[in-house]
């Protein structure tokens, strides 16, 4: 679809100056934030021109619509700056995966446990996957034991979000989330 973004942005924008049509009166707010009361649209446009600022429609659905005298360019700049700041503050939570086998030896287990601990302390969720091959499917209890061992080793820094009752296909998956500090 061509031009989809433009139409979406047009809906976000406030109407300014001569774009405000279809109304006779507006509730006017001055540059200092004080209410000037209900005035005709022409008086509001004259006041904006006199002050050297724009007449910006803040809430078009109100009766009468609320308009404010302000520098629209500065308003847009502040708004985009605020949105960027909020986006920076949001932390993207990732799900990291560590794979085990039912016969994982002690050395490998400790390395994988260290990685899990590092991911959880970094604030990421972790997915612990136990993969079964061939005849290992007959010994699913080994997978459950391994998941319980991981759960117990990490219980002071994590909470279990989901724990498998049985194997899904040829694997068991447990999801751990970091403790809230």
Swiss-Prot record:
Cellular component aspect of the GO annotation:
cytosol; membrane
Keyword Membrane assigned to the entry: answer is no
Q: Which cysteines are joined by disulfide bonds?
A: none
**Principal subcellular localization:** cytoplasm
GO process terms (BP): ribosome disassembly
Q: Does the keyword Protein biosynthesis apply?
A: yes
Cell compartment(s), UniProt: Cytoplasm
| Domain of life assignment | Bacteria
The molecular function terms in GO held by this entry are:
ribosome binding; translation initiation factor activity
Q: Which Gene3D superfamilies match?
A: Translation initiation factor 3 (IF-3), C-terminal domain (3.30.110.10), Translation initiation factor 3 (IF-3), N-terminal domain (3.10.20.80)
Keywords, alphabetical: Cytoplasm, Initiation factor, Protein biosynthesis
Please give the function described in this protein's UniProt entry: IF-3 binds to the 30S ribosomal subunit and shifts the equilibrium between 70S ribosomes and their 50S and 30S subunits in favor of the free subunits, thus enhancing the availability of 30S subunits on which protein synthesis initiation begins.
The similarity annotation says: Belongs to the IF-3 family.
- Subunit arrangement? Monomer.
> What is the protein name for this chain?
Translation initiation factor IF-3
Q: What is the lineage of its organism?
A: Bacteria, Pseudomonadati, Pseudomonadota, Gammaproteobacteria, Alteromonadales
Quick one: which gene encodes this? infC
């Amino acid at each position: 679809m061509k031009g989809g973004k433009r139409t979406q942005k047009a809906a976000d924008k406030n109407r300014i100056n001569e774009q405000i049509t279809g109304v006779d009166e507006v509730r006017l707010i001055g540059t200092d934030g004080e209410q000037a009361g209900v005035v005709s649209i022409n008086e509001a446009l004259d006041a904006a021109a006199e002050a050297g600022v724009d007449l910006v429609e803040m809430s078009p659905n109100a009766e009468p619509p609320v308009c404010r005298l302000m520098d629209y360019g500065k308003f847009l700049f502040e708004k985009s700056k605020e949105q960027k700041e909020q986006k920076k503050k949001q932390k993207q939570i990732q799900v990291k995966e560590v794979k085990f086998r039912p016969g994982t030896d002690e050395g490998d287990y400790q390395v994988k446990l260290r990685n899990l601990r590092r991911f959880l302390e970094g604030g990421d969720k972790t997915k612990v996957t136990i993969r079964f091959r061939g005849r290992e499917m007959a010994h699913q209890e080994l997978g459950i034991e391994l998941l319980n061992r991981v759960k117990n080793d990490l219980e002071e820094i994590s909470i279990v979000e989901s724990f498998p009752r049985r194997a899904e296909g040829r694997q068991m998956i447990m999801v751990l989330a970091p403790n809230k500090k």
